[in-house]
């Protein structure tokens, strides 16, 4: 039976992870290791300035107190889950992780940590907060496909599911990340003691939502599957940077 480490960034009791855990447990061995609270936007942060403790809930799920999604996967793979899991699944996230969202997403970061530790990894997000069961069924289908036809690309699959009943989903599309306009909104107010308080505003509007993007696929009713990689090297830019250094007469010396 496939051993799955299931995590998220919305917190261990969030509806997305609980619906997905219930669906996966029908056919797989699932261990939930997730933050004890909402850690959306935590990206790939690791906790290095203090110790971490865990709490095992009545249903066997493990919450990491004050931990990030990356902490949860790191601890789960390296210490808490025995035998070692065979795949990391992150989600179901409440809301999409499209375009630039992947930079900040704790959901994607949890999957990325799983891949960094040598495991296949899926990040699952729902473009809303109603049809978690649809996203759970899509995840089960993807896992069945991975078992019958293994994917050897070594990538993270970032999966975004339209917030629709399953029968209204049109199919799968392999996509690239689109992009958003830069977010600039900041909300502020003054507390009774005169201190200024600030809240970061919503993400920017869509900028690149062309036909091959994750934005377009989800908007048209398709499940978007975007392969992501841990290696952030911009290989096509290496020659440009070498030429730039040569023109600046640096020649590789400081």
Curated annotation (Swiss-Prot):
What cofactor requirement does the entry state? Answer: a divalent metal cation
UniProtKB keywords:
Cytoplasm, Hydrolase, Metal-binding, Nucleotide-binding
Top EC category: hydrolase
Q: Which SUPFAM superfamilies does this chain map to?
A: SurE-like
Q: Does the keyword Zinc apply?
A: no
Which Gene Ontology terms of cellular component type are present? cytoplasm
- Which positions bind a divalent metal cation? 9-10, 40, 93
Q: InterPro entries of this UniProt entry?
A: SurE, SurE-like_Pase/nucleotidase, SurE-like_sf
Return the similarity comment.
Answer: Belongs to the SurE nucleotidase family.
What is the name of the protein in this document? 5'/3'-nucleotidase SurE
Q: Which organism is it from?
A: Photorhabdus laumondii subsp. laumondii (strain DSM 15139 / CIP 105565 / TT01) (Photorhabdus luminescens subsp. laumondii)
